[in-house]
From Swiss-Prot:
PANTHER family according to UniProt: MITOCHONDRIAL RIBOSOMAL PROTEIN S5
Matches recorded under SUPFAM superfamilies: dsRNA-binding domain-like, Ribosomal protein S5 domain 2-like
Residue stretches making up the S5 DRBM domain: 8-71
Assembly with partners or alone: Part of the 30S ribosomal subunit. Contacts proteins S4 and S8.
UniProt-listed GO biological process terms: translation
GO CC annotation terms, alphabetical: small ribosomal subunit
Protein family (similarity comment): Belongs to the universal ribosomal protein uS5 family.
Protein purpose: With S4 and S12 plays an important role in translational accuracy. Located at the back of the 30S subunit body where it stabilizes the conformation of the head with respect to the body.
Sorted UniProt keywords: Ribonucleoprotein, Ribosomal protein, RNA-binding, rRNA-binding
GO molecular function, one term: structural constituent of ribosome
Protein name, UniProt field: Small ribosomal subunit protein uS5
Domain of life: Bacteria
InterPro entries in alphabetical order: Ribosomal_Su5_D2-typ_SF, Ribosomal_uS5, Ribosomal_uS5_bac-type, Ribosomal_uS5_C, Ribosomal_uS5_N, Ribosomal_uS5_N_CS, Ribsml_uS5_D2-typ_fold_subgr
Gene this protein is translated from: rpsE
Source species: Aliarcobacter butzleri (strain RM4018) (Arcobacter butzleri)
């Protein structure tokens, strides 16, 4: 599925510095976790690793466009409650009445913002590791039956 990248917005969820200790000292690299979405029912996430931060972000964006999923949005919210677990992270998503807004924290918030859901209540249960929480949220949104 060919997508027009200009229609999508991006959010950098996490940038981390990782270290490899070698004989001559330490070698630093950077990891990036990025979420992309068109605020109209399509969202994806990706990770990238490189020696410089901008390169890691670019790799993460390329990865994110390979993992786009379609979200079934009913009005400004989702159709039903859903609970999804990925590794030790668990996310609970509940539909909310119009005007409630986006009540979500941590790494789940940018995923829900960029998916186009405007009224939702999300609760993170278990681990708040950004990588696992983003994946749990995306998988939960993909499982919703319209």
């Amino acid at each position: 599925m060919a997508v027009n990248r200009e229609d999508f917005q991006e959010a950098i969820v996490k940038i981390g510095r990782v270290t490899k200790v070698v004989k001559g000292g330490r070698r630093f690299r950077f990891t990036a976790l990025v979420v992309v979405g068109d605020k109209n029912g399509t969202v994806g996430f990706g990770t990238g690793k490189a020696k410089e931060v901008p390169d890691a972000i670019k790799k993460a964006l390329d990865d994110a466009f390979k993992s786009l999923v379609t979200v079934s949005i009913k009005g400004t919210t989702i159709a039903h409650d859903i609970e999804h677990k990925y590794n030790a992270s668990k996310i609970l998503l509940r539909p909310a009445s119009e005007g409630t807004g986006l009540i979500a924290g941590g790494a789940a918030r940018p995923v829900l913002e960029l998916s186009g859901v405007k009224d939702i209540i999300a609760k993170s249960l278990g681990s708040n590791n950004p990588n696992n929480l983003v994946q749990a949220t995306v998988e939960a949104l993909a499982k919703i039956k319209g």
